[in-house]
């Protein structure tokens, strides 16, 4: 990091703030004239100069001060060491210099380790990754937790750093450890909406069924935080990615997960990890990664893929086996559309409870489908007007329709509340009605048992007959 590049105050990583807004660090630029020592300095002045050199990222001055005898593990106000500060701002060169001078990579302050501080640093993932790699090379333990029982991998997952997650696991980090609230790294990634991290954790063997203390699994956490794409992906029962990398050695895992770009490209990239889009995540979840290039060549989006017919699959070169995987996944995610002409008329007294419950369930599913559709539109809508390629009508038209839509949603909410109150009223009246006879539990009689057995026998015979007929036809 260049001298003077930092202006912000360093705080403890992972949301664990220090005891004061002023951690003893003076933020700002150091006068060029004072960057070289002009003779021996008193200890207090030397410490102050050391802090300023760390703050501005002045590597040469830091080295000069260390050469003059100042301790590399100096404890500043509130217990932070120079290495902890350098890690908190992801200053790779400063971290390297301090480690080479003997700084303790395993230091912690109130269970806030330097590795945790690095994983929760603010900066580019590439810089954070290099800092973490340096600390791990000096035997920093990736499984030491903070006061909230959060480990480095949880902080990396929470902040959306898939490469850092992969590196930590390659050095022995536990994927499925839980914090004080029962959150795993996967839960944190799902909560924050980091789909790349979710995908990587599943590949590394993360358990998507581990519950938090309030009984929620990662998919439910994602849904609660309106990350419906991740919710749908985690809800798929088929997960061929799970544990794909668990059998590899440490060296093989690092090589596979951290393939870097050429030196010329490193300075221009946020990371060397490929960002996955909606289509890639869907295909990875089904083990259909080989289809990615084919679909991209034909400009087929995820939305188009999900609405394809049988003949379109074949026309686009998708074989029957892959078609079946896609259709099976769609069936799991399918939201049944309501045909209002077929809905029961609530006014009829002979309507059954099952029919009415089915109506409410369908209505609820349809609302969820509408929410997902609107969220997808919000995600894909250009933020800046200059990114719109085709000419649009006046935005006022869209705004007015949205206002009408909001009014309709409010009206729907009001009517549903009325329906809920009415059902509650009917339930209370029924419970207080002295003439109401509660439903008796169904008692299995001798006749009913015979009837059930007869029905099972008939069904079994019919199935056997069907198999025989099918065999004859094939011959």
From Swiss-Prot:
It is found in: Cytoplasm. Interacts with DDX4, PIWIL1, RANBP9 and TDRD1. Residues 1-23 are annotated as: Disordered. The gene is ASZ1. Its main location: cytoplasm. GO terms for biological process: cell differentiation; male meiotic nuclear division; regulatory ncRNA-mediated gene silencing; spermatogenesis; transposable element silencing. ANK repeats lie at residues 45-74, 78-107, 110-144, 148-177, 181-210, 214-243. Coiled coil: none annotated. GO terms for cellular component: pi-body. PROSITE patterns: ANK_REP_REGION, ANK_REPEAT. It holds the Pfam family SAM_2. Residues 272-334 form the SAM domain. Residues 1-10 have a biased composition (Low complexity). Plays a central role during spermatogenesis by repressing transposable elements and preventing their mobilization, which is essential for the germline integrity. Acts via the piRNA metabolic process, which mediates the repression of transposable elements during meiosis by forming complexes composed of piRNAs and Piwi proteins and governs the methylation and subsequent repression of transposons. Its association with pi-bodies suggests a participation in the primary piRNAs metabolic process. This is Ankyrin repeat, SAM and basic leucine zipper domain-containing protein 1. The modification Phosphoserine is found at residues 17-18, 20. Keywords: ANK repeat, Cytoplasm, Developmental protein, Differentiation, Meiosis, Phosphoprotein, Repeat, RNA-mediated gene silencing, Spermatogenesis. Gene3D superfamilies: Ankyrin repeat-containing domain (1.25.40.20), Transcription Factor, Ets-1 (1.10.150.50).
